[in-house]
Design a protein with these regions (language model features):
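Sec-dependent signal peptide recognition
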Residues: 4-10
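C-terminal motif of bacterial Sec signal peptides marking the signal peptidase cleavage site
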Residues: 17-18
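Accessory "access/gating" subregions that flank catalytic or transport cores
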Residues: 32, 165-186, 195-205, 214-219, ...
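Mature N-terminal segment immediately following signal peptide/propeptide cleavage
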Residues: 36-52
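Active-site cavity-forming subdomains of large catalytic enzyme subunits
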Residues: 46, 110-116, 120, 125-230
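Alpha-helical support elements that line or immediately flank enzyme active sites
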Residues: 48, 52-59, 197-200
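Active-site-surrounding "flap" and adjacent substrate/cofactor-binding loops of secreted or lumenal enzymes
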Residues: 57-103, 118-120, 142, 153
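N-terminal leader/propeptide and maturation segments of large enzyme subunits in energy/redox metabolism
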Residues: 98, 102-114, 118, 124-153, ...
């Protein structure tokens, strides 16, 4: 049975089980249109691909002014459409005169390239179908990684993903591959980029999404990085909620608020969320909000976010929190 058919059946299954007893002991059912949800899944992959390739233009251009690598002021809206500046990885001989900061789009007949975030999500989608399961086992994850990820060639894995992959090659299985004892990159961004899809595979049931995503998240993350990844699984699950909203903005804010409830108030993800929300409500523009976040967390290291003190390459620019 094809994956899409299974997903449709799963959505129908949720129609019967995703319910709560109301005041009168009556069940409230969640009904999801198969056609509409298929279109939304298409939008997920398309939007993610456009965002990936558009952001790659400016990736690593601006990482702040702390440590050995300093890149000057951050970009602003005035830079959109202008010439892309050199990243910290690019040789000075690279000609940037024709590289503009703009959307990257492709024709419907083209094939999108990718890196580890979308690749691994696509792999997890495949492994669920291949193994005919909704909960992947440690062996299934390890075998899938070793089969589908290049070992000796460039595989475009970064940070915790690469460490976990190396550990798998040595015989280790998840969740040990994400344990801080074995993986010193457990606090990086990897898990939140590679497990959002489990929220989409559990529409309007974040509790199911978290169960499906638990081991994949722990494959590369722990503590706050794990919590942030779970936050995004919940958001993606709630994106298919059946509530009525006056606008997309109202819908997104509701999703964010509901997902915020999962965050521990004492940890930096919750404090970062609250600080960013406060900045938004203050009415300042996004450039000033971005600069305020940089100052508070990367310069001043507030709310327990101490990545800068670890003296990591590019000041921990791939860390889960600041991203």
């Amino acid at each position: 049975m094809g994956f899409l058919k299974k997903l449709i059946l799963f959505s129908l299954f949720l129609f019967f089980i995703a319910c709560n007893k109301g005041i009168n002991n009556e069940f409230e059912y969640i009904e999801i249109s198969r056609e509409n949800y298929t279109n939304k899944l298409h939008g997920f992959w398309l939007g993610q691909s456009i965002a990936n390739w558009t952001s790659l233009i400016t990736e690593m251009d601006k990482i702040g002014n702390i440590g050995e690598i300093k890149t000057g002021n951050f970009y602003t809206r005035d830079d959109w459409g202008g010439i892309d500046q050199r990243s910290i990885w690019e040789d000075s001989l690279v000609n940037k005169s024709r590289v503009k900061i703009d959307f990257v789009l492709k024709d419907e007949s083209d094939i999108w390239g990718s890196d580890d975030d979308t690749d691994i999500e696509y792999m997890y989608q495949y492994l669920l179908n291949f193994n005919d399961t909704s909960i992947l086992s440690p062996n299934q994850i390890r075998d899938g990684w070793l089969k589908h990820i290049k070992s000796n060639e460039e595989n475009y894995l970064w940070e915790s993903n690469q460490v976990a992959f190396d550990l798998m090659k040595s015989g280790m299985k998840p969740p040990e591959t994400g344990d801080p004892i074995n993986n010193n990159s457990y606090m990086m961004i990897d898990a939140q980029l590679t497990t959002e899809i489990f929220g989409l595979l559990s529409p309007s049931r974040p509790d199911i999404g978290l169960k499906m995503a638990e081991l994949p998240i722990k494959t590369t993350a722990r503590y706050e990085a794990q919590e942030i990844a779970e936050f995004y699984v919940i958001m993606h699950s709630l994106a298919s909620n059946s509530k009525e909203f006056n606008s997309t903005k109202e819908n997104i804010f509701w999703i964010a608020k509901e997902s915020r409830e999962h965050l521990n108030d004492n940890n930096y993800p919750a404090k970062m969320y609250d600080f960013t929300e406060k900045l938004y409500k203050s009415g300042i523009n996004w450039e000033n909000a971005r600069d305020s976040i940089y100052q508070r967390y990367q310069v001043d290291q507030k709310d327990g976010y101490n990545i800068t003190s670890k003296n990591l390459y590019c000041n921990g620019c791939f860390a889960a929190g600041i991203n």
